[in-house]
Amino acid sequence: VIDPHADYVFLSMTRDAKNYSNRITVFQTLKSTGRYNLPRKPEIYQVKFSDLSLDEIAYVCGIEERYTNILRSLQNALDELKNKDYSLADLIKTLKSTNDKSKAESALKALNYVEKLEKMNIFGDVTTDMLKILKPMHVSVMDLSGLEDRVADYVTFRILTEIYSLREKNQFEFPVFVFIEEAHNFVPNKENPLSKGIIKRIAAVGRKFGVFLILITQRPNKIDQDVLSQCNSQIIMQITNPEDQKAVRASSERMSEDLLKDLPGLNIGEAIIVGEMTKVPVMVKIRQRETKEGGADIDVVDSLQKATEKAKEEEKEKELELKEIKKMMQTTEGY
């Protein structure tokens, strides 16, 4: 489960915080901001820095293709470190030690980009073994909360690429179901983030290798239409935006105009299911979830009520302090 906002981190717990399943593992990066208590401590996901290619480093750093001199300086530094088990610190040190004056300016600019990676906290001594993440009859949640978009995109790209490769080469023998929350951010209609290519490949041919894709989004209009049309079944909840309705209609041959008109009027928990999972479109009522919810919106009314109570308590404390001060002053005057 690709989880950008820590929505799925409590899958192992019931709504009253009891154990629900031992077959669920949460993975975090050191930069993940999700703060929660789980029966088991989350596993750390990290990437060995020397595993990154030049293109991957440039993408995560935000170095554009047109900055050819900066990219050349970065490539020169990587060439110096070639065949070594180098770290991010080694690359920074190599860029700093550039002695050639003609290359020093570009190396310094490259250094400014590369030093940003130190704050990302996803690079370690080893890359997390995918076979720790992929297990039979098991759910692994990748908590990407708090990561910059490019970093979250890179982690998603790397995980999905490794999953696809393992299944393509039959190095993991069981089918894999990949859930991508906020899918419009990873496979958008217009932009081309790093993970878009591998998601499109999985959508097109993944089922041949036992990799199945489940996209979750509130904005279907923002998802690449080729990928959306590859979804054989759709579970559609309330949609009021006309552009999103058009995207759903265009991606499903079984979505009639009558059904489309029903979408804005669906109540909470109601959905229309179309596609290969059902012979005809059906409307269903989805039961309440059994597991604890993560990443939910705050209860604004409750929070404001608590804020009001807190403010009143502080006012009372100030009044008591003033009374004490007046009492002390009166006592002093009496002397």
Where are these regions (language model features)?
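Short coil/turn linker and secondary-structure boundary residues
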Residues: V47-L52, Y86, S102-E105, T240-E243, ...
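Conserved ATP-driven motor cores of ASCE-family P-loop NTPases powering translocation/secretion/packaging/pilus
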Residues: I202-K285
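Non-catalytic surface loops within mature trypsin-like serine protease
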Residues: G146, N241, Q288-E290
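Short secondary-structure boundary/capping segments
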Residues: T14-N19, L194, Q230-N232, S252, ...
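Glycine-rich loops and low-complexity Gly/Arg-rich segments
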Residues: I24-F27, L54, L71-S73, S165-K169, ...
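P-loop NTPase motor domains
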Residues: V1, H5-A203, K208, N267-G275
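Conserved P-loop NTPase motor module
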Residues: G269-Y335
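Repeat-unit-sized solenoid/scaffold elements
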Residues: E64-R72, L88-T94, P220, T240-D258, ...
